[in-house]
Amino acid sequence: FDAYCDHLLVRDAEGRLILADALTRASEEKPELVIDMATLTGAARVAVGPDLPALFARRDETAEALLRAGKINDDPCWRLPLHEAYGEWLKSDIADTNNAHANAFAGASVAALFLDKFVGKDIDWAHFDTFAWRPAGKPGRPKGGDALGLRAAWHMLRERFG
């Protein structure tokens, strides 16, 4: 990751550049696992609604552990694909990658594929694309800001690392 040139194709997707820097920095430490949580796209919210954060994971075991932990803690998540073919949409003629794509398809998956480029290939990685805002309250979950996915991640981390 010493020199990576990004084409800022979509100015409204600049936050993922900051997260890419953080993921690059985290990868330098060679951790076993990196989990990031961000309000990255509106596309994830459209896809899964207000009760579920979109979950992306490189490894099925990690995704399954997070989904299971979400069920146990009443903090459900929904896995969306890191479909490699969509990575073609991030290709740039003038840089190593684009920060987004110009079409209207698979916005959350393409954003996650962008982030995937900045995590060391040998590192297990999961990404929650969460809007973290609940438009209406329900028992145990008030209206307003909500840490969607946090309970699931915490439970999985405790199980995995003690």
PLM feature segments, named:
Residues 1-162:
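A generic structural signal for tightly packed, nonpolar segments enriched in small/aliphatic residues
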